[in-house]
Every structure is written in C-alpha cells, then in structure tokens.
From Swiss-Prot:
It comes from Oryza sativa subsp. japonica (Rice). Keywords: ATP-binding, Calcium, Cytoplasm, Kinase, Lipoprotein, Membrane, Metal-binding, Myristate, Nucleotide-binding, Phosphoprotein, Repeat, Serine/threonine-protein kinase, Stress response, Transferase. Residues 380-415, 416-451, 452-487, 488-521 form the EF-hand domain. The gene is CPK7. The keyword Transferase applies. This is Calcium-dependent protein kinase 7. Coiled coil: none annotated.
Length: 542
C-alpha cells in the first residue's frame, strides 16, 4: 500500500534509480507480489488473484465492502482535494487542505475495487491500526483522519514536502560517515521504537523515508506501513514480503522475525556510504541469489577509504544468522555511531513503559478520565495496545498477573525492580495489585496525543459533569467511581489537588490543566486566565 508525498513515488513503485551498471530494474508494481514470484511453491490462487471485473461478473459489488467497520464523516466536508502527488499500486495520494484551518495534508485514497481479497481488506485495516499505534513519534508520519465512503478509504496524514531520502542519496552519491551515522541513527531509532511497540515494518528501504524539509536531511519521517505487522516476541513469520534489494535471507527462507528489519537497515547504511546496494545482479533471481550468498563487497571504491568501524557495524547488521545479528537497540550503541557523536544508551523506546510508570503517580480523577477516553477510541486506534496486551496475557484470560507483567516487560527489553512492577500493578488496578484488566491496561498506556485531543477531553469532562453545570464536584466524582467499581475514599483530597482557585470544585480549564500537565506528581501549574473558562464556553461535541 504505497504512500506518496512530493518529489517522487513512495511505497510499492520502484523506479530503477541506482546507476545502471549496479542495478536491475525489477518489474514495476507491488514488491510484495514480486517476491511471491520468487517462491515456486506459492499457492496459485495468490499469484493469480481475480480481477474486480471478474467479481462484478459474479454479481458481487466490491464497493459494498466496509473496511473500517464503522461510519465516518464525508471527507469532502472537511477537506478540499487538490492535485495528485503520486500513484501507488493500491492507492493514489493527493494534496488536501483542511477547510477549517487551511492546513495542507496528504490524502491517500485506496479504491475499494482494488481490494479483491479478504487479505487486501485486512492489510488496509492493519496499516491504519499500526499508524495509529505509532502516532506521536517524531520520525513517523502522523495520521490525522481516516474516512470511508462507498468508493474508497481515505487516509489523511502529515504532508512531507521535502521528498524522499532516496532522492537525497542519489543527488549526493554517498554521504560522509558523520552524515550517514546521523541518518542511520534516526532510521534505526525508528526500527527500535517499532519493535519495542510490537511492530515489524517488513519493507524498510530509502523510498519509505521522507523528509519534512528538503533542506534538512535529518527531518526524516517513516512512511508506508502497508506490509507491517504486529508481532509477539519469539513469533515466527513465513510470508514472503519486502523489496528485493533489502530483503533478509531468512525472509527468503520463510522463517523470520523482527531481525529482518535490522538487515534491511544494514542495507540502507551500505547504500548511504556507497550509493549502491550490497546485493545486486542483472535479474531479480540474481539479486535473491546474492542475498542468500551474503558476500559483502568492501574492496571497491569508496570502501577502502571508509573506516573499519563503519564496516564492522555493517557486517554485524548483515550477519546471515539472525540470532547473531545486532538488535536495533544494540546498533544504537555501536562505537561507530558513538564516535560520530550521535549515540544513545536507550535500549528501548520507553513510550509505553513510561506511561505505565506515570500512571502509578496519577490521581483517581485522571485515571477515570483516561478510562472514559479509552472507551471512546476506535478499534484501529487501540489495536496496537491490544496486541501488546495479548503478548503479555499469555493465558488469554483478559487479565495480567504480576508475573506475566514482569516477564512481558523483560521480553520487550525493559528491566524493572519488583517494587516498581508492584507500583504499576497497584496503580493500574486502582485499589489492589493482583491483576490488571484489559481496559485498565489500555487506559494506562494511552499515548499523549490521544489524551490531549480536545474532543476527548470534553467528552471525559462531560462524563463527570452529567448535569451540565460546568463543574465536577465530590458527589459527581463519587458516582463515577461507583460506575467503575473504584474505591471512593479521599475524594475531597482529589478535588483539592486539581482545584486551582479553591472553590471546592473543578471547572473545565482546571480539568484540562490536570490532563495536559505532568503525569508525575500532582502539583498542577496554574493555567493562563485566557484558558480559565467553564464548560459552557468550551467547544461542543458533535
């Protein structure tokens, strides 16, 4: 499911941009299908999918498919669709302008007539779920809205006007080692973040990284999660996906895991330093043979002038044995990256874990509000957190025990003391530390960008302020605690923690200040007087 912004095609289309003597232009189109052609045992039904026309001849209407499983607003009521930015195998990307703000975005439109199989529909759903799951990371293209009508699914996302990283490589031939180290640190940081959140990209290549600003090589955004999947630690995948130059050998052997993303990143690093891929041939079959053979050329120019440390990192990222290959967080600690001044000691993107820690310091009102917000989110927005819960809930009971949480954190690369895990258990389960239920886990791990959305904040406030007075009182909070089976002790203290003007109740501005303030500690900052408005002055929920 290719994506596109300015200055080139992104995603599934490949335009043979490497120098001719070093490259082969494999068949334009979806690289996912190209890889299937390599596999002689691939089921015939998948190689020869029925066309939309053949479906229509059988009396079926592909436009009747409900991809999102819910009704959405009309895209054109909120956005003006502009010029075409590019064309992919499954969708077309357009420039669009939000009517209310005048802000420009990219809108990827996927016609339903191209969603021929159940797997095609699931691929689109999963792509949207993963984009929501990863939203908020500064180096991942932000998803803004998703719409569906009778003809298509429309994904509105951040507009990246700087073009492709691939184009920058082509323009410069190869980067200095310092620049390459800076770029690969960002790319591998994205990979490490994805893996820590239980996502495997499966199609890493320069074309799938965009620049927000054409003058800033470091303004990188990862795009195109059409082949990405959720995974659990130790899970083995067998589906042949990816792009020939960047595919790992274990993918061709149909037995792989997230280590394959590190291989692809290693190929990107080789390209960043030399301008050509390490494995190439005059045919697609030849490329695969070269990948399986695994010989890396460090003799041709410019490699004699490149440091041994850089070559050491490439060798360790392109180790043929996945278990011996560096993990993403280990790449970030390699001496070559450290020597270039952009190293990090971060072994795991802490987004989910830090939210769990913050949750342990949160008052009951904020916890309740997060539960309300979590219940309002669509399935695709919480799908990633659901998969993480399932990975920890090994017995499929819908609850997590102390031991399961400790083991799950360890498998995701996080080390906590038993006392810290106990604090998390106690906080997330409100009043005891025996188990964490699914709903409590979702509320505790909501990303900040979900919490701070105006419509979610207003809906949560309205949940407490059922009579519409514009204030949350002790009585209202007591009723809410009862509805969620939470202990209602210390409610007056909870009110006083949030009540900034000491009138014994919480207005909308104070509620927003609590939700948007620091989650650690309860000393909320006083809001500016311009924000000190009651609910009656806040935007209305539609």
């Amino acid at each position: 499911m290719g994506n596109q912004c300015q200055n080139g095609t992104l995603g599934s289309d490949y335009h043979n941009r490497f120098p001719r003597e070093h490259a082969v232009g494999y068949v334009q189109g979806d690289s996912y299908l190209d890889l299937k052609k390599f596999d002689d045992t691939w089921p015939e039904v998948n190689n020869f999918k029925p066309t939309a026309a053949s479906i229509l001849r059988r009396g079926l209407d592909p436009t009747s498919i409900n991809v999102l499983g819910r009704k959405t607003a009309d895209l054109r009521e909120h956005y003006i669709i502009g010029r075409k930015l590019g064309q992919g195998q499954f969708g077309t990307t357009y420039l669009c302008t939000e009517i209310n703000t005048g802000c420009e975005y990219a809108c990827k439109t996927i016609p339903k007539r191209k969603l021929i199989t159940k797997e095609d529909v699931e691929d689109v759903r999963r792509e949207i779920q993963i984009m929501h799951h990863l939203s908020g990371h500064k180096n991942v293209v932000a998803i803004k809205d998703v719409y569906e009508d009778g003809q298509a699914v429309h994904i509105v996302m951040e507009l990246c006007a700087g073009g492709e990283l691939f184009d920058r490589i082509q323009e410069k031939g190869h980067y200095s080692e310092r620049k390459a180290a800076e770029l690969i640190r960002i790319i591998v940081s994205i990979v490490a973040m994805c893996h820590s959140l239980g996502v495997m990209h499966r199609d890493l290549k320069p074309e799938n990284f965009l620049l927000l600003d054409k003058d800033d090589d470091l303004s990188i955004k990862a795009i195109d999660f059409g082949l990405s999947v959720f995974f659990k630690p130790g899970q083995v995948f067998t589906e042949l996906v990816g792009s020939p130059y960047y595919v790992a050998p274990e993918v061709l052997h149909k037995r792989y895991g997230p280590e394959s993303d590190v291989w692809s990143a290693g190929v990107i690093l080789y390209v960043l330093l030399s301008g050509v891929p390490p494995f190439w041939a005059e045919t697609q079959q030849g490329i695969f043979d070269a990948v399986l053979k695994g010989h890396i050329d460090f003799q041709s120019d410019p490699w004699p002038k490149i440091s041994d440390s850089a070559k050491d990192l490439i060798r360790k990222m392109l180790s043929h044995c996945p278990s011996e290959r560096l993990k993403a967080h280990e790449v970030l600690r390699h001496p070559w990256i450290c020597e270039n001044g952009v190293a990090t000691d971060q072994a795991l993107d802490p987004s989910v874990i830090s939210r769990l820690k913050q949750f342990s310091a949160m008052n009951k009102l904020k916890k309740l509000a997060l539960r309300v917000i979590a219940e309002r989110l669509s399935e695709e927005e919480i799908a990633g957190l659901r998969e993480m819960f399932k990975a920890v809930d090994t017995k499929n009971r819908g609850v997590i025990t102390f031991g399961e949480l400790r083991e799950g954190l360890r498998r995701f690369g996080a080390e906590f003391k038993d006392t810290e895990i106990g604090d998390i258990m106690e906080a997330a389960h409100n009043d005891n530390n025996v188990t964490i239920h699914y709903e409590e886990f979702i509320a505790a791990t909501l990303p900040l960008n979900k919490i701070e959305r105006e419509e979610h904040l207003l809906a949560a406030f309205t949940y407490f302020d059922k009579d519409g007075s514009g204030y949350i009182t002790v009585d209202k909070l007591q009723r809410a605690c009862g509805e969620h089976n939470m202990e209602d002790s210390l409610l007056e203290e909870i009110i006083s923690e949030v009540d900034q003007n000491n009138d014994g109740q919480i207005d909308y501005a104070e509620f927003v200040a609590m939700m948007q303030g620091s989650n650690v500690g309860l000393g909320w900052q006083t809001m500016e007087s311009s924000l000190n408005v009651a609910l009656r002055d806040a935007p209305q929920v539609h």
